[in-house]
Every structure is written in structure tokens, then in C-alpha cells.
Design a protein with these regions (language model features):
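Amphipathic alpha-helical scaffolding segments comprising HEAT/armadillo-like alpha-solenoid repeats
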Residues: 2, 26-39, 60-76, 97-110, ...
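Structural detector for internal amphipathic alpha-helices that build alpha-solenoid repeat scaffolds
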Residues: 4-27, 49-63, 85-98, 117-132, ...
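Short inter-helical turns and helix N-cap capping residues of alpha-solenoid HEAT/ARM repeat scaffolds
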Residues: 9, 43-46, 80-82, 114-115, ...
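Short, contiguous, helix-prone interaction/anchoring segments in small proteins
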Residues: 35-55
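Generic beta-strand or strand-like secondary-structure segments
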Residues: 54, 68, 72-75, 79, ...
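Hydrophobic, aromatic-enriched interface-forming segments
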Residues: 138-161
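Eukaryotic acidic, Ser/Thr-rich intrinsically disordered low-complexity regions
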Residues: 215-260
């Protein structure tokens, strides 16, 4: 692309997106990966995004191509260009919003990619898939909660956060499995996620209720401090004020959590 995507007018952008989609569809029908790879590896982030969104739409609108699409993504995942691998993972994330089983293996591989961009694409995909297709995604994520690699544990913890913002009850049992985490960076992410799933309407009650069942009082204390702080930082968006959150915790948690 000669001009950057957002240098174009709105109509020109729509035309580019349509062209990308049509070209990818034609390439999939003929199993020509070169054209797809060109879009997947484009320097412009928005071109790559248009490409993976197109793959997701094609997968569901052209069911006869689903096998070919997965095989094409399998082949492209072997490419040396990290941008192409990253876009493969994002494409799988679009598909996994509905059909996770068919693309699960992309995330198994992507978690261990040598480039952080591909690993970050796994986190982003877990977030967007988990928001709308939580059952199989959280079941998959649970398998990695105790992985020997601390970065894998951290990425999984981070990835399930978005689902928890609306439905904290869905991810709290998974977070509980990390309550005795010894690695500071993973523990910090755990506390951060607990804070992030606490500030919307009705969520604090769910979170505090579940934290009552945790045995590690130190991590619970850290989580409560983060929850109160989040209610201050997000004061324009949170259901309760900082003071109300602190009062609710004090009234509903059976112990003085500040006594560490």
C-alpha cells in the first residue's frame, strides 16, 4: 500500500477493505498463500487487521472453505516474519469467537512463539474470544495456569481478565488457583486482574464473596488494597466510590485484612 490506511478517505478505506477481502477469498479458493502472506505481513497495522478480520468473516460465510483456511493458517504460522505469525494468531482469534476447537492449536503454539508480538496476539485473542465464547476458552486457559514458565502463567492470567470484567464469577475460580504464586510478576498481574474485575456494578460483591474462600490472606490483603485503589483511579466509571468500596470490604470480609 502506497498510502497509510488512515491517510485515505473513509470511502477509500472501505474500498481497500473490500479489495483485501476479495483478494484473500480468491487466494483461499486457489490455495495461493503468497497474496495472503503479503497482507498478513504488511507494515501497516490496519491492513493486517483488515486481513485477519476478513479471514474471520470468510470462515463463517464460506463454510466450504473452513478446512482450507485452517490449513493456510497452519502453513503461514511457520513463516519467519513475526508479523505474519501475529496475524495468523489474530485470525484464529476471530474464528475462535465461535469455533474455538478448530483453532485451539494456534494458541498452544503461539504461547511459545519466539516473538513477543505473537505471544501478545494470543493474550488479545484470549480476551476477545473469552468475552463471547468463554466455556471452551477458559477450559483451555486452565491447562496453563500451573505451567512451569512464569510468563505463560502471567499471560494466561492477563488474558482471561476481559471476561471477568462483566462476569467475575467465571474467572475467579481460575484466579484462585494462582493464590500461592511465588513469582512477583505473576502475583502482581493476579492482583491487578482482581482489581480490574471489581469496579463495575455488582462485581465487588461477587469478588469479595469469592475472596472469602481463599486461604492466602496476604494475597487477599493485596487484592483489597488494589480494589480500593482501582475505585479511586476509575472513579469516573466505577459503580462505587473509593470510600464505599472500602466500607463494603470492611463490613463484609470477616477479618481485618490490613493485619498482614
Amino acid at each position: 500500500m502506497i498510502m497509510a490506511f488512515y491517510d485515505l478517505s473513509k470511502q477509500e478505506r472501505l474500498d481497500v477493505v473490500a479489495t483485501i477481502s476479495n483478494n484473500i477469498l480468491a487466494a483461499l479458493r486457489t490455495s495461493l498463500l503468497k497474496k495472503i502472506a503479503a497482507y498478513f505481513g504488511d507494515e501497516d497495522t490496519y491492513i493486517r487487521k483488515s486481513a485477519y478480520l476478513s479471514v474471520g468473516r470468510i470462515y463463517f460465510f464460506h463454510k466450504g472453505l473452513q478446512y482450507k483456511i485452517v490449513k493456510a493458517l497452519d502453513a503461514l504460522l511457520l513463516n519467519d516474519n513475526f508479523k505474519i505469525r501475529q496475524t495468523v494468531i489474530n485470525s484464529a482469534g476471530e474464528i475462535g469467537k465461535i469455533d474455538f476447537k478448530n483453532v485451539e492449536h494456534f494458541f498452544d503454539k503461539g504461547l511459545f512463539d519466539t516473538h513477543h508480538a505473537s505471544r501478545n496476539a494470543v493474550i488479545g485473542s484470549i480476551k476477545k474470544m473469552g468475552e463471547v465464547n468463554s466455556g471452551p476458552v477458559l477450559h483451555w486457559a486452565k491447562n496453563y495456569l500451573h505451567h512451569p514458565d512464569k510468563e505463560i502463567r502471567r499471560e494466561i492470567c492477563h488474558g482471561i481478565e476481559l471476561r471477568g470484567r462483566k462476569y467475575p464469577q467465571d474467572i475467579l475460580p481460575l484466579l484462585k488457583e494462582l493464590q500461592y504464586e511465588k513469582t512477583a510478576r505473576v502475583r502482581s498481574t493476579l492482583v491487578h486482574v482482581i482489581g480490574q474485575i471489581s469496579y463495575k456494578k455488582g462485581c465487588l460483591e461477587t469478588v469479595v464473596g469469592h475472596l472469602k474462600t481463599w486461604e492466602n490472606k496476604q494475597i487477599v490483603a493485596d487484592a483489597f488494597e488494589e480494589i480500593i485503589d482501582v475505585h479511586y483511579r476509575y472513579r469516573n466509571f466505577s459503580a462505587l466510590t473509593e470510600a464505599q468500596a472500602a466500607q463494603y470490604i470492611a463490613e463484609n470480609y470477616p477479618e481485618d485484612y490490613k493485619k498482614k
